[in-house]
Amino acid sequence: MKIYVVATIAWILLQFSAWTTTDAVTSITLDLVNPTAGQYSSFVDKIRNNVKDPNLKYGGTDIAVIGPPSKDKFLRINFQSSRGTVSLGLKRDNLYVVAYLAMDNTNVNRAYYFKSEITSAELTALFPEATTANQKALEYTEDYQSIEKNAQITQGDKSRKELGLGIDLLLTFMEAVNKKARVVKNEARFLLIAIQMTAEVARFRYIQNLVTKNFPNKFDSDNKVIQFEVSWRKISTAIYGDAKNGVFNKDYDFGFGKVRQVKDLQMGLLMYLGKPKSSNEANSTAYATTVL
């Protein structure tokens, strides 16, 4: 009997150890019921502060830098409205989207994910509300071009720019997937807006300032917004390798005019590219324009 009891206790302790070593996923919530510009800015700051390494600084600037990859792989973003919550999953080491969670028209929680970015087990940890049976791999990929194609945008250049940005727009597209039967077009449009209103505003204060300036109204996006969004790696690499005391060693053009002062880019968060370079290394590093 004693042996049985000891074995049972040991098994329980082993299970408890396994449970407690499972990394808790950090959640950050944006309340979309009468939000203010200040509340939205605080929400964006929380994203930056959660993923940055306070000890990392690139190019002699004070711009936040994402920390190196760690065991805490994902960040959960919750959008709350008067009708419920829709959640977005982001990778902590680059803020790329991996999944979203929403109730369907029968009030069942369903998790939809990009299979190249997250496993079923990781998805369960990220969105425990959805059972494995209610997980579905998306039929398209996580890049903007693929999502835009499925969003079926017919205006202008048929890109996400044509949808605009803004808190009111985020709420509109959130409600299109909240407690509704799945419609791929609505889903893709929600993802396009949600990604930009979370990851992109965290990366670029320029975009954040447009949102708060027009808050809470929808506003037309512009080419500069799109150029920023496709240039995060290029900008981060230039600051990392070719800036000293916040000044580039030469003029750079990322698609919206030449810049020499890093501050003119209004950056909010840089990509992790390793340990900061010394001043001598930065001065001797020529930025490769072919970097994607």
UniProtKB/Swiss-Prot annotation:
EC number of the protein: 3.2.2.22
GO terms, molecular function: rRNA N-glycosylase activity; toxin activity
Similarity comment: family membership: Belongs to the ribosome-inactivating protein family. Type 1 RIP subfamily.
Name of the top EC class for this enzyme: hydrolase
Keywords assigned by UniProt, alphabetized: Hydrolase, Plant defense, Protein synthesis inhibitor, Signal, Toxin
Gene: SAP2
InterPro entries per the UniProt record, alphabetical: Ribosome-inact_prot_sf (IPR036041), Ribosome_inactivat_1/2 (IPR017989), Ribosome_inactivat_prot (IPR001574), Ribosome_inactivat_prot_CS (IPR017988), Ribosome_inactivat_prot_sub1 (IPR016138), Ribosome_inactivat_prot_sub2 (IPR016139)
Record's catalysed reaction(s): Endohydrolysis of the N-glycosidic bond at one specific adenosine on the 28S rRNA
Organism: Saponaria officinalis (Common soapwort)
Signal peptide annotation: 1-24
Location of the active site: 200
GO biological process per UniProt: defense response; negative regulation of translation
Protein name: Ribosome-inactivating protein saporin-2
Described purpose of this protein according to its UniProt entry: Ribosome-inactivating protein of type 1, inhibits protein synthesis in animal cells. Useful as immunotoxin for pharmacological applications.
